[in-house]
A protein has these predicted regions:
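Acidic/glycine-enriched edge-of-secondary-structure segments
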Residues: 13-32, 52-55
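Short beta-strand scaffold segments in enzyme catalytic cores
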Residues: 119-122, 146
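Amphipathic alpha-helical interface segments
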Residues: 134, 141-175
Length: 175
């Protein structure tokens, strides 16, 4: 239900933002064409980056660590939300544990979850990427992700991910 609420709000943001340049502000990307814009958003971050990706891959993790090293040194906080190493259901838990440890050593804050992990990124509490792409795992061409500028949606994702999960989430897209 919470995911439907976020998708509804993002859909509202997409349709209400038609006056702006859709390709720059609000857009839907496929698994084959989001990376360049996503990486630019990451490199434009000034305060913080939160990436929630249930699945992770060594290639994407080490690419992210390398790409964001200077950002981190400049004070940008990076948080990764992902499954516990033994919750992946495939592969070697020791390998996932090592990836988590390498991200920690690189200065990333790691929040692990056991049951549900959404797929999104929030940059500077305003730029939101939300969809079914695992941002830290292998891309699938048929997956998609939406990019919107919305402090409200960013706030809701933060509340769902880090806040009181028992609190009812408002789903009124006309706020």
């Amino acid at each position: 239900q919470r995911q439907m609420c976020i998708r509804d709000r993002i859909g509202y943001e997409l349709s209400s933002g038609l006056k702006a340049d859709k390709q720059i502000v609000n857009a839907i990307y496929g698994g084959d064409n989001y990376r360049e814009t996503f990486h630019k958003d990451l490199l434009d971050a000034n305060k913080n980056i939160i990436i929630s990706s249930p699945a992770i891959s060594g290639q994407k993790v080490y690419e992210l660590i390398s790409m964001l090293k200077e950002k981190q040194e400049a004070g940008v906080q990076i948080t990764i939300v992902t499954w516990m190493p033994d919750s992946y259901g495939f592969g070697d838990a020791a390998y996932w544990m090592q990836l988590h440890e390498d991200m920690r050593k690189a200065g990333f804050y790691i929040k692990t979850v056991e049951e549900y992990c959404d797929r999104f990124a929030v940059i500077d509490q305003e730029v939101v990427w939300y969809g079914n792409i695992n941002l830290l795992a292998k891309d699938k061409i048929d997956n998609s992700i939406m990019r919107v500028m919305s402090k409200d949606i960013a706030g809701e994702l933060m509340e769902i991910t880090f806040g009181d999960n028992d609190r009812e989430v408002r789903c009124n897209v006309n706020d």
